[in-house]
Amino acid sequence: MLGIGTISRKIFGSPNDRKVKATRPVIAQINALEPEFEKLSDEGLKEKTEEFRKRALEGESLDALLPEAFANCREAARRALGLRAFDTQLMGAVFLHQGNIAEQKTGEGKTLTATFAAYLNGLTGRGVHIVTVNEYLAKRDAAWMGSVFGALGLTTGVAYSDMPEDEKRKAYASDITYATNNELGFDYLRDNMKSELDQIYQKQHNFAIVDEVDSILIDEARTPLIISGPSQDRSEMYKTVDAVIPQVRDDHFELDEKTRNVTFTDEGNEFLEEILHAQGLLEEGQSLYDPESTTVVHHVNQGLRAHKLFQRDKDYIVRDDNVVLIDEFTGRMMPGRRLSDGLHQAIEAKEGVDIKPENITLASVTFQNYFRLYDKLSGMTGTALTEAEEFMEIYGLGVVEVPTNKPIARVDEDDQVYRTAREKYEAMLEKIKESNAKGQPVLVGTTSIEKSEMLSNMLKQAGITHNVLNARQHEQEAQIVADAGKYGAVTIATNMAGRGTDIQLGGNVDLQVMNALTADPDADPEALRASIEAQHADEKAKVLAAGGLYVLASERHESRRIDNQLRGRSGRQGDPGRSSFFLSLEDDLMRIFGSERLEKVLKTLGLKEGEAIVHPWVNKSLERAQSKVEGRNFDIRKQLLKFDDVMNEQRKVIFGQRREIMEAKDLSEITTDMRHQVIDDFIEQYLPPNTYADQWDAEGLYAAVQEQLGIDVPVMDWVEEEGVDDEAIRERLVEATDKLMTEKAGQFGAENMRNIEKQLLLQAIDTKWREHLLTLEHLRSVVGFRGYAQRDPLNEYKNESFQLFESMLDSLREDVTQKLSQIRPMTEEEQQAMIEQIRAQQAAAQAAAAGPTVSAQAGPVAGPADAAVAFDENDPSTWGNPGRNEPCPCQSGKKFKHCHGRLI
């Protein structure tokens, strides 16, 4: 019997059906315009672009321009690439332009789809960012689709790491910019450490199209981008602690694989105290619970996590004396990305490689908050519907399933569940042999490098030629994936999310065409494609006769989305294909979430060695377990976002003020307001309201005025005067400081004074914000314990972080006021030297952002990749970026502000 919801959908259609239906008249308009645009010359296509630009500037909406613009873009793509966009690709582009996520199945041509929405929105001249998951795809797509944009008269750029700054600024100034999500986020942070407007990369955040949007906005949502600087070296502590961990017994800790957490038991804590005392890490009489034990306990906890939660060749690999993390969703290496809070150092100690110093945060942002900066955001992926609720709640993005150009002919078989992993792999080997014997290409999906290499060894012993795609073969990725659809091909891949290259039966025609065009840019794209397709036809026919691509997965992932991405590699563009999952009760997901019930079923059925249970309810049971995991992860991301939103509001205020300062011509009003506010604070502190004169702290006020305001006025005499009140003293201080600064401006010259004010303000903001970030990190790490006292940690964090922010602003005002009061007239050379010194200190911080060394919470962090440079008192770039109250890097023992950081 049909449910009410099912009957309703049959009568009225689903919301998705209605959205698709609404675009059909627009697609019909575009198709009707096609003959008109086919008649245009190459120059005529560019002239149309100029016409559209003019109409947009005159107020015509992009929606009104869409049919003509899409028709123009379709014709340009046909001429430049030999590709005529399908109606379904145009439909996907409409959804992108409307600010949705377009779910297009693998092989439906997302790369070309994006060009239409990018072209239309690029007509405004405000820039469009097309976001990819790796630099290879960014460069490939920019070169490939750049020919289309070029034919239309738009400029295309690609921003990637390690490129010259001038070239990167030019790339961002293009109409269309391709870049990875990491590079965009880091460049945003770098921009907010710059001191001159002409150094800025990202002028505005107009429209972003995010490819593999689920990978970037869901899987990496908990990953903060962090620009960091070096802190003190604790490598010996990590080595000492690492020697302790192997002595820990199983009853000394509790491991929760569901939450990926490990903690010491009471027995473990007792054992720790004993062994740490023996190692000299705890002093006689010192307990683990003493405040002074915090650091060593933190190191021990991270050491335990490194040994019990992180596995070599699954979570990371060791390459060239470095621990390189592996993306659990894509299987790619993530060079330069480091775990935070000393966890990466603990893994380095575990593996016996060089231990790099921990880093301190200079600037950070999450992908969630970075991509919410854009005026309009859209995305593409083959799998988004399972996360539709999160996309809408977090980003305000709707998900629309775009119809396939041809019906899907792939057969998705029920899961086969074996009792042991050995039985499962033996069954998989037989399946691979069977398919390979008839020439059917096989794509074998695994979840770790270790398992992919184990399967590879089994195939070698069986004499089956094959390719392996995992983090170790990262560089050959595109070619391995492109060849996976060839006759008789066997490919083992560790996760297929965001691979970017299409698996086409018989081989990837698009990649061959692109390679040929790169080798001969003057070749006719349509003729070249026709020639390659003719050669490819026989190969494809053989593969079709063998049954198409067979996807064989060795495990289910925690996310249904990742499983669907693997399945979706087969059956592209209506091709035949097959997919199946071979599982065992020893698999991680089965073991953690559902093996007990299945174990009973298997025993009841009395399955023999090598037999498997195959039934639809097994699939449903696993999908329910996956759904629970997805829901839990969504809740974690929501909670983390609530905390990050607190910092994000403060970040927007600071970065906004910073940009205003950089754009301002005259900052004297701002610095005057700061100075007056400092005076108000002094009056309130030392001459409290509603108090008598004999209760005032005149000596404290006098000392503060001398130190902070740089004036020597008879405060002690003023307070003795008959009838004088706090307001009168305030006015005298304001008058005296205003007079002082007016004199300084006259002595320096107005232009020099404005430059000094700007540089001092920017330096103070950067220093105070960096210190504030560190304070917030510490607060965030301990605020969770407030829950034990029946206090909401989030509210506690909000309240205390606001108070800390207010305190930071007070400190900022005092710092700027004090520095401005201390400057004295200099020669022109001295003035320039001081400005250059301040800029050099800022440049040192920016230099930390230039290299790809980074990390936090498994997040990317940009930081210094080289060893510390020796201090040179004549070269400020070697000074690092110490805070005003930190020790001077010259090792004089003085505070930086009293030594080389002195501004006099």
Swiss-Prot record:
Its cofactor is Zn(2+). One of its GO terms (biological process) is intracellular protein transmembrane transport. GO terms for cellular component: cell envelope Sec protein transport complex; cytosol; plasma membrane. Signal peptide: none annotated. Its EC number is 7.4.2.8. The keyword Cell membrane applies. May bind 1 zinc ion per subunit. Keywords: ATP-binding, Cell inner membrane, Cell membrane, Cytoplasm, Membrane, Metal-binding, Nucleotide-binding, Protein transport, Translocase, Translocation, Transport, Zinc. InterPro entries: Helicase_ATP-bd (IPR014001), Helicase_C-like (IPR001650), P-loop_NTPase (IPR027417), SEC_C_motif (IPR004027), SecA (IPR000185), SecA_CS (IPR020937), SecA_DEAD (IPR011115), SecA_motor_DEAD (IPR014018). GO terms for molecular function: ATP binding; metal ion binding; protein-exporting ATPase activity. This is Protein translocase subunit SecA. Belongs to the SecA family. It catalyses: ATP + H2O + cellular proteinSide 1 = ADP + phosphate + cellular proteinSide 2. It is a peripheral membrane protein. The keyword Cell cycle does not apply. Zn(2+) binds at C888, C890, C899, H900. Its main location: membrane.
